[in-house]
């Protein structure tokens, strides 16, 4: 009997190269038939009897894992954020959970720089004005000589530092485990969070959603920022208190913001949506051809390793 692999990723996130690798191994592929993330019940319906799963934004709950526990060996996340997977339950059932570190780093770093530029020059406001028949020029700010504060210096944070350095920016950073090679290459200076929030002209978030980071950007921290400063979040929506951010934007406590991620996705219509000095994108940091192929192939390779009796490379279940 063929081993069955459930592909949770939507069609636009399924690289042909990923599917080809799995098909070459003779696996039966069960594809997500919807142009959206599958619900818990839809996953449960498909996971029974499966040997492996590739997860996109799917919420792989305890119920899902319990349904597949007799045959399921691995859930391979197509990306690095695994907060939608019940890792504790997976550990209890002996199921590996793997990630694809580095696969989308360049793409997210690219989008982050795009958001920084968009905020600095308020490109969306000019676009909206011209579409409405108005000739509007926004007086923006240059990046050269400005200070960028990066919170989280993993692969993505390092990629942002590389790009910001090329723009002539000074870089402050916070990370629990400082990587000194970034200091040598890009002049990154590590400091504490409060110092960074007070000193930076731009704050870019690249931290995971952990108990100690959820809600880290709140009213108190936003009040530390310069009135001319901008907040960028292309990491996890849970890091920012969106109500506090809306208030800071409306009262002029900070100059602007740009978000690619939200507390709930798709985001709810809130006061934040009514702010003019903010740019929104649709959690699109990893949505490039290169990142989709890279993450998909890495996830497929992890499945092949596990189903052939080998240890996975990037198992987050300890």
Q: Locations of the language-model features?
A:
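An N-terminal-biased, well-structured beta-alpha scaffold segment characteristic
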Residues: 1-98, 218-220, 224
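Glycine-rich, N-terminal phosphate-binding loop of Rossmann-like dinucleotide-binding domains
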Residues: 9, 55-57, 79, 205-207, ...
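Short beta->alpha connector loops at strand-helix junctions that form conserved
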Residues: 32-33, 78-79, 95-106, 194, ...
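Short, Asp-centered acidic motifs that coordinate Mg2+ and/or phosphate
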Residues: 51-52, 74, 202, 230, ...
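Rossmann-like adenosine-cofactor binding region
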Residues: 61-65, 176-271
């Amino acid at each position: 009997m063929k081993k069955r692999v459930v592909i949770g990723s939507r069609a636009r996130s399924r690289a042909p190269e990923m599917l080809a690798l799995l098909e070459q191994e003779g696996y039966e592929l069960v594809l997500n038939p919807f142009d959206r993330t599958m619900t818990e019940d839809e996953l449960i319906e498909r996971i029974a009897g499966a040997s492996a799963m590739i997860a996109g934004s799917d919420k792989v709950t305890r119920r899902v894992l319990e349904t597949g526990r007799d045959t399921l060996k691995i859930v391979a996340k197509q990306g690095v954020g695994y907060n939608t997977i019940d890792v504790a339950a997976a550990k209890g059932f002996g199921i590996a959970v793997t990630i694809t570190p580095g696969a989308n780093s360049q793409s997210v770093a690219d989008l982050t720089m795009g958001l920084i530029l968009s905020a600095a020059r308020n490109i969306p406001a000019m676009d909206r004005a011209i579409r409405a028949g108005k000739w509007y020029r926004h007086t923006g700010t240059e990046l050269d000589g400005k200070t960028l504060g990066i919170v989280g210096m993993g692969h993505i944070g390092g990629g942002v530092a590389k790009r910001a350095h090329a723009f002539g920016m000074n870089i402050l950073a916070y990370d629990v485990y400082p990587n000194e090679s970034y200091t040598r290459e890009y002049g990154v200076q590590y400091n504490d969070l409060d110092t960074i929030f007070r000193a930076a002209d731009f704050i870019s978030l690249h931290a995971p959603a952990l108990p100690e980071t959820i809600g880290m950007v709140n009213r108190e921290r936003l009040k530390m920022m310069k009135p001319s400063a901008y907040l960028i979040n292309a990491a996890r929506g849970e890091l920012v208190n969106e109500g506090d951010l809306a208030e800071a934007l409306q009262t002029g406590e900070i100059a602007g913001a740009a978000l690619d991620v939200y507390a709930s996705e798709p985001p709810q219509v809130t006061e934040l949506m009514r702010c003019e000095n903010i740019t929104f994108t649709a959690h699109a940091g990893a949505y490039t051809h290169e990142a989709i192929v890279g993450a998909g192939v890495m996830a497929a390779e992890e499945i092949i390793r596990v189903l052939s009796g080998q240890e996975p490379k990037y198992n987050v279940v300890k």
